[in-house]
């Protein structure tokens, strides 16, 4: 069980993400992380092992990370030990796709083996990194939109999950998908 939060708007995203994660901390306290797109369109990722307090300290309560679009995650480890490396968000090899995930990807080992054969490297022992790189694979292979790439990946992923992703080439957008797992989206 994990907690996912996202924000797109006019305010600085990091403090809002951290506030949202604090409300979801009961869903996971092994590690936490955020990804925020800065004004130069680069996506900055900050992660911390342990409770959310560590991430809050690392980001100066969000005031050291600038941008108005981001995703955050608080983790309860299912695949891979609690560590900063296994903390979400995870990225594609080139950093174009960034994602967080809640749930279980049952066939992640099989998908990972196929991605390794296609030149992908893995740094964590999580199923989430596999999902992010699978989406990246379809995004690059077929030159589809993020929605098409996510749809191609979802057809191949077995399990119950919810995903939130950002693409460096699509600023101020967050893409979400779910299968048999809850996802609530609010608009204010």
At which residue positions do the language-model features occur?
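Conserved short alpha-helical segments that host acidic/polar catalytic motifs at enzyme active sites
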Residues: 1-188
